Amino acid sequence: MGHYDVVPVEEASLKQWEYPAFSGFISEKFIHGRGSLDDKVAVIAILESVEKLLNKGFEPERSIIMAFGHDEELGGNKGAKAIATILRERNIQAEFILDEGLVITDGIVPGLKAPAALIGIAEKGYATATLTAKVDGGHSSMPKKENAIVVLSEALVKLKNNPMPSQISEPVQFFINDIGPELSFVNKMAFANQWLFEKLIIQKYQATNTGNALVTSTSAATLLQSGMKENVIPMIAKATINFRLLPGDDDKTVRDYLKNTIADDRIEISMSKDFSPATSISPTNNKAYQDISKTIKEVFHNTIVAPSLMIAATDQKHYTGISENRYRFLPVQLNATALKGIHGINEKVGIDNYQLIIQFYEQLIQNACFKTP
């Protein structure tokens, strides 16, 4: 799986790019431009790998379906969702599904020297809430002590200071189990004795944005709306809050959290209809996962493989019921700097890296189909 739509580039950032953002410029070592990591790289690499296999005369012993969406960044309702609907209508059951997702991290996992290939065995849920503060307005020359903007701001501060409870979910537990033995002595000891060090482990995760997202159902204020004129105190102020939910949390969990944390009757809470729960957790003790893990080790030498939780949303959420084995992994090696290019500035993929991505898909198809040309 993959998608060939991309997120836009803010006009104010265009001059900060090394090369034009949509040029696809190929320099000596990199392919530059929006989509070079998310996610045109997977689409083109899959097609190139299939073309190479066909040129070798490869004949798979089973069907291989390539599903490419055109609106993943908008939710996938007209792309992946439509494809998945057709597959269900045809009663197609896949042994496994592989979509974009986690990557091969280089120097990102604290205490781990070797590169780590992380396979997403589940992805977080998605929910959006709108907070509406309603307070009498008036003229700015005679302000009251409180108005809608102030009341809403106080609510947002409460959410910031009182996040949802952190926990080690099952996918993160699997990650700890596999990565723990590869860490330094202190970290290894902590991971091996979670009954004693669980709070410390969670605190360590909470120290970074990415780590915190692995152990917490996060919330982020993304939209604000209020006021129409500088000398008029508005009667209404609205904020949109986006949540990414750990397995086990749902829209009721979010509503209860908002109600109890804000505890202000002047704030109305409404939940968007586009809620999607965290996906089911795919197994790691089956041939499908082992095929992916084996292929990673064959192509990316000296790389540790571990399951984990996908903190962002992918098109996989639409494929419920088509396979119990749904995985999220993009075979690209990235350090912390390169990761910032995804949805950011100077998105690019190394040419050598891209060749390995093609090799990965080519090898995976052969491993999964039991037959080599």
Predicted features and spans:
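Acidic/histidine-rich catalytic neighborhood of metal-dependent amide-processing enzymes
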Residues: 33, 37-118
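An extended, acidic, His-containing surface patch that forms the Zn2+-binding/catalytic region
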Residues: 105-106, 168-228, 235, 247, ...
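Short amphipathic alpha-helices in soluble, non-transmembrane regions
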Residues: 146, 254-262
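A common structural junction motif
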Residues: 4-5, 159-163, 259-267
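A short core secondary-structure module
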Residues: 77, 81-86, 141-165
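Short, solvent-exposed loop/turn segments at the edges of secondary structure
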Residues: 19, 61, 92-93, 113-114, ...
